[in-house]
Amino acid sequence: MDEKPLVWLGSSLRELRAFPEVARRRAGFELSLVQQGLLPSDWKPMPDVGAGVVEIRIHTGTEHRVFYVARFEEAVYVLHAFEKKTQKTARLDLELASSRLTELNRNRKDKRKGDRT
């Protein structure tokens, strides 16, 4: 299987680059597994964000999360990366990832329409 490219939506790459080095390296490793069609080491489905969205859970003394969707053939889309500061994921983080997924779905739909004309 070919490795899927990563597509960073919104400010997700900048968000991940702001992680401490250990968390950033772990996130990179986990995303490389996903690119190869494998599951990350510690993950959880996030149906409240949208269909097919998965949360990578990174534990390095502080908690970091990366939301992605890999259900599309062409790429792994990274929706959001953030430091988790409370037990429950903040509504703002869930809404941001959800809005980026909505935009992704809209752009993919528009592209398919353009390909048919």
What feature does the model see in each segment?
Residues 1-63, 72-76, 83-117:
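Basic, Lys/Arg-enriched alpha-helical interface segments
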Residues 67:
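Short, surface-exposed charged micro-motifs
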